[in-house]
């Protein structure tokens, strides 16, 4: 889409933050209005993360206006809210390509812009990185400032509090901005609070505060009285005691949509020494009524008509694997009150909305706390309950030690329902589920299953739920099933694959939902096709039988080749001294960028044509 200068005259003046800082302060509200409208127009045409960015327009403008970016370091947590940041930092005309193949990255990305200090996508990393940036700048005496922006969801994670605890100890010159959009701006975030924030962040108050501490440092009773008086004054209007106890100077909460007020407060805070904390209140979806009313639905959107405010409905076709999981969860919980379902802030994405409403006493959203989710599940298992941890593949990485130390070593019967395994698509490198088979396969006593369709997914969830000798994992992709008939639930024999087609010379050992592509290739090559189903334990007897009956084996998976299911097949053959050629097909040894799932699979040779071509090239 071409940029309409007449429609956005103030925004047209801002091709960089240097130009932004040349604008008169009085023009900033108009800039914010145009930026918000441009964001709405762009994302509705291209798709992307939406509501979060609408809520951070004023904050983004104020930060770049006050701080000398990119020299000063601005770090965004997660990055859903960073679209306005991209627009103001030289990427305005490319914003329509975001999350598309070859387009702008969905999150701040170091390789894309000097303004993107930290590549992000996962939650709660900003403060830790910000401390490092601040310490590095101090050691080099560069007078460079560091600012982190973190949301009210991300700040609940343990990593954020670990970082703040460290900051309180070493006291770097760092500003943490809490973007609190959990509720609309309420009465306690009004004129008094905004005035107090500017007063408490000002040089006069800061000088008196620090000077008083020095003068009375040797008089403990007076020092303590001053401390309590300050806390009392702040405590009348602010909820910052926790952050003060962690060693931060807390300011807020203030109106995050008052750009002029934010500029004044940030200017006051810019030169303060030590860890600073600014708490702003924003409205997710601000300025677009449908998104304000339903920020969860409008968090990430497909292309839609923003004049109607109606998102396109799904085609009503095949159910997603997430829905298959959610339906299985409800079906099983209706029969077994011992089932306990756990999610780290992924209720909607994991298909658990209906379950959370029907079985609220058996549902636990632990927030962005993957480590806690896994060890919490371990405790439930110790208490003779049956925990099911619903988690995205990419986020399970954050709880790897807990899977090993708190679950697997103790052989606790915890079921991991691993969604978004394999190619995820538009969210790019940080969200592809490329590694779970590799890092789970090496854990002793772990059962790892890869369904080839939605019916097999249900059967595997049932199998894992009723397995009592240790943890089980069922990994399934983002997207819809194949239309398979859903059969009555029954446990599968552990570690047994199924021959789907008998052929000659070549055997294709498929792990997961690429089975339809593998079937098309097997038909063309007259190859044997096997649905292996289990990555661990592998069907050793079947692998050895196939090796004895065929000239070559091909393994197929949507996981990293290194350490994946195919590597397991190689290990079996080497251990039994079977000298049969094996071609491992899967994800290559680099981080997979964004695109649609179909585009990425075609690029990687994981569609039927690509798989066939890889086999032909290998045999040539």
Curated annotation (Swiss-Prot):
Keyword Lipoprotein included in the entry's annotation: no
Stated role: Catalyzes the acyloin condensation reaction between C atoms 2 and 3 of pyruvate and glyceraldehyde 3-phosphate to yield 1-deoxy-D-xylulose-5-phosphate (DXP).
Binding site for Mg(2+): 152, 181
Sorted UniProt keywords: Isoprene biosynthesis, Magnesium, Metal-binding, Thiamine biosynthesis, Thiamine pyrophosphate, Transferase
GO biological process terms, semicolon-separated: 1-deoxy-D-xylulose 5-phosphate biosynthetic process; isopentenyl diphosphate biosynthetic process, methylerythritol 4-phosphate pathway; terpenoid biosynthetic process; thiamine biosynthetic process
Pfam families: DXP_synthase_N (PF13292), Transket_pyr (PF02779), Transketolase_C (PF02780)
GO CC field: cytosol
Main EC class the enzyme belongs to: transferase
Family to which this protein belongs: Belongs to the transketolase family. DXPS subfamily.
InterPro entries per UniProt: Dxylulose-5-P_synthase, THDP-binding, Transketo_C/PFOR_II, Transketolase-like_Pyr-bd, Transketolase_BS, Transketolase_C, Transketolase_CS
Species annotation: Klebsiella pneumoniae (strain 342)
Pathway: Metabolic intermediate biosynthesis; 1-deoxy-D-xylulose 5-phosphate biosynthesis; 1-deoxy-D-xylulose 5-phosphate from D-glyceraldehyde 3-phosphate and pyruvate: step 1/1
Protein name stated in the entry: 1-deoxy-D-xylulose-5-phosphate synthase
Cofactor binding note from Swiss-Prot or TrEMBL: Binds 1 Mg(2+) ion per subunit.
Chain positions recorded as thiamine diphosphate binding sites: 80, 121-123, 153-154, 181, 288, 370
Phylogenetic classification of the source organism: Bacteria, Pseudomonadati, Pseudomonadota, Gammaproteobacteria, Enterobacterales
Primary gene name: dxs
Catalytic activity reported: D-glyceraldehyde 3-phosphate + pyruvate + H(+) = 1-deoxy-D-xylulose 5-phosphate + CO2
UniProt cofactor(s): Mg(2+); thiamine diphosphate
Subunit structure: Homodimer.
One GO MF term: 1-deoxy-D-xylulose-5-phosphate synthase activity
Enzyme Commission number(s) of this protein: 2.2.1.7
Keyword Protein biosynthesis among UniProt keywords: no
């Amino acid at each position: 889409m071409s940029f309409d200068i007449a429609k956005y005259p103030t925004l047209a003046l801002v091709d960089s933050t240097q130009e932004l800082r040349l604008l008169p302060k009085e023009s900033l509200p108009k800039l914010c209005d145009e930026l918000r409208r441009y964001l709405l127009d762009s994302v509705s045409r291209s798709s992307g993360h939406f509501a979060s960015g609408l809520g951070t327009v004023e904050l983004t403008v104020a930060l770049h206006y006050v701080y000398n970016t990119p020299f000063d370091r601005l770090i965004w947590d997660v990055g859903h809210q960073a679209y306005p940041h991209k627009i103001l930092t030289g990427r305005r005309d490319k914003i329509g390509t975001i999350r598309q193949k070859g387009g702008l990255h969905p999150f701040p990305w170091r390789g894309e812009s000097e303004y993107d200090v930290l590549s992000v996508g996962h939650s709660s990393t900003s403060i830790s990185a910000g401390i490092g940036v601040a310490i590095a700048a101090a050691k080099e005496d560069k007078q460079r400032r560091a600012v982190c922006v973190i949301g009210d969801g991300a700040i609940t994670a343990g990593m954020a509090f670990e970082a703040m605890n460290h900051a309180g100890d070493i006291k770097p010159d760092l500003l943490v901005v809490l973007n609190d959009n959990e509720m609309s701006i309420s009465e306690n975030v009004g004129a008094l609070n905004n005035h107090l924030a500017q007063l408490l962040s000002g040089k006069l108050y800061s000088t008196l505060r620090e000077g008083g501490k020095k003068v009375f440092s040797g008089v403990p009773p007076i020092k303590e009285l001053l401390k309590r008086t300050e806390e009392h004054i702040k405590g009348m209007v602010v909820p910052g005691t926790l952050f003060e106890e962690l060693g931060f100077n807390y300011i807020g909460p203030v109106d995050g949509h008052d750009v002029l007020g934010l500029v004044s407060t940030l200017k006051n805070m810019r030169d303060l020494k030590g860890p600073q904390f600014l708490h702003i209140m924003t409205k997710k979806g601000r300025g677009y009524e449908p998104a304000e009313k339903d920020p969860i639905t409008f968090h990430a959107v497909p292309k839609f008509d923003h004049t109607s405010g109606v998102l396109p409905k799904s085609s009503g076709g095949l159910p997603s694997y997430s829905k298959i999981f959610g339906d299985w969860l409800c079906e099983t919980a209706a029969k077994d009150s011992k089932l306990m379902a756990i999610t780290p802030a992924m209720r909607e994405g994991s298909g658990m909305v209906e379950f959370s409403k029907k079985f609220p006493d058996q549902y636990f959203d632990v927030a962005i706390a993957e480590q806690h989710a896994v060890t919490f599940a371990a405790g439930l298992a110790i208490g003779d309950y049956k925990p099911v941890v619903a988690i995205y593949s990419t986020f399970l990485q954050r709880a790897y030690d807990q899977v090993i130390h708190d679950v697997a070593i103790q052989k606790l019967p915890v079921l991991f329902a691993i969604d978004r395994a394999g190619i995820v698509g538009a969210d790019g490198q940080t969200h592809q589920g490329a590694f779970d088979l590799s890092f789970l396969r090496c854990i002793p006593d772990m059962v790892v299953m890869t369904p080839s369709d939605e019916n097999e997914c249900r059967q595997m969830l049932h199998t894992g739920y009723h397995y009592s000798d240790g943890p089980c994992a069922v990994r399934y992709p983002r997207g819809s099933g194949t239309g398979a008939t859903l059969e009555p639930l029954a446990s599968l024999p552990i570690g047994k694959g199924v021959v789907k087609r008998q052929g000659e010379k070549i055997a294709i050992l498929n792990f997961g939902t690429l089975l339809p592509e593998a079937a098309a290739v097997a038909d063309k090559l007259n190859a044997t096709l096997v649905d292996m189903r289990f990555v661990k334990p592998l069907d050793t007897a079947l692998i050895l039988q196939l090796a004895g009956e065929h000239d070559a084996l091909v393994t197929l998976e949507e996981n990293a080749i290194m350490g994946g299911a195919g590597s397991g097949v190689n290990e079996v053959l080497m251990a039994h001294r079977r000298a049969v050629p094996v071609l491992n097909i899967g994800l290559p040894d680099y981080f997979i960028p964004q695109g649609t799932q179909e585009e990425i699979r075609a690029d990687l040779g994981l569609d039927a044509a690509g798989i066939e071509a890889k086999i032909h090239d290998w045999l040539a």
